[in-house]
A protein has these predicted regions:
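Helix-turn-helix
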Residues: 14, 18, 22-56, 60
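An amphipathic alpha-helix signature
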Residues: 16, 87, 130-138, 184, ...
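Hydrophobic alpha-helical connector segments
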Residues: 60, 74-105, 153-156
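Short, basic, alpha-helical segments at the C-terminal edge of helix-turn-helix-like DNA-binding modules
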Residues: 63-69
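Amphipathic alpha-helical segments used for helix-helix packing
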Residues: 85-88, 99-127
Length: 220
């Protein structure tokens, strides 16, 4: 039976969506093609009508998950007043609900350790999406050069994702909730940039001479 291009596109999207959820739940190597196709209501043999390889599916499924996260962030950032935008995204990201439901959450905390061991092609696709996430934040860090905004945004994203990983390791516990709360504060602090450190007082000349003599003695 021949299917229309529209039907094929819908089926393709359904497979990608199923794979996206299962990969985040079980990891890149925890999902078999046969089981995935069965869950999508299709036969194992139909897989290659949609994907050239398992790697192609993995890349597309990762991309789908990350694109959805970025789009949610951009929507939230665009809808709120400037002074509330970053806090709203951080608050919605670092929640017990997100911690406890990796299958429908951000792909980076769920899969980044595995992606680092995948092929260069897979890592490149993942990195491009990760950069888009950083840019989504950088667009809303005002009053600084773009390079500085990206640096702060990268620190924010890294803090948020690292916090979620730690919170999941700690499980549903008081300590895990404490990690989430601390991560929120730290992520928002990243947006403001580092506080200026006090300048170190110059060393007295006598101290420099003593230090030099001590160093010379140690070299003997």
């Amino acid at each position: 039976m021949r299917y229309s291009p529209e039907h094929k596109a819908e089926t393709h999207a359904r497979i990608v969506r199923k794979a996206s959820v299962r990969l985040r739940e079980r990891g890149a190597h925890g999902v078999g093609v046969a089981d995935l196709m069965k869950e999508a209501g299709l036969t194992h043999g139909g897989f290659y009508a949609h994907f050239a390889s398992r790697e192609a599916l993995v890349i597309e499924a990762f991309g789908d998950a990350m694109d959805r996260s970025t789009e949610r962030w951009r929507k939230t950032l665009a809808e709120l007043a400037p002074e509330k935008r970053l806090a709203a995204v951080v608050d919605s990201y670092l929640t017990p609900q997100h911690r406890d439901d990796p299958g429908h959450g951000c792909a980076v905390p769920a899969l980044s350790a595995e992606i680092a061991r995948e092929s260069p092609k897979t890592r490149k696709a993942f990195a491009a999406r990760l950069e888009a996430m950083v840019d989504a934040f950088a667009d809303h860090i005002p009053d600084v050069p773009r390079k500085t905004a990206r640096k702060r945004a990268a620190a924010m994203v890294a803090t948020m994702m690292g916090t979620l990983v730690m919170a999941r390791v700690a499980g549903s516990s008081e300590f895990s909730d404490e990690i989430l709360a601390a991560g929120k504060d730290a992520a928002l602090a990243c947006a403001s940039g580092p506080k200026e450190l006090p300048k170190r007082a110059a060393k007295p000349a006598t101290q420099k001479r003593v230090t030099s003599r001590t160093a010379a003695a140690l070299r003997r």
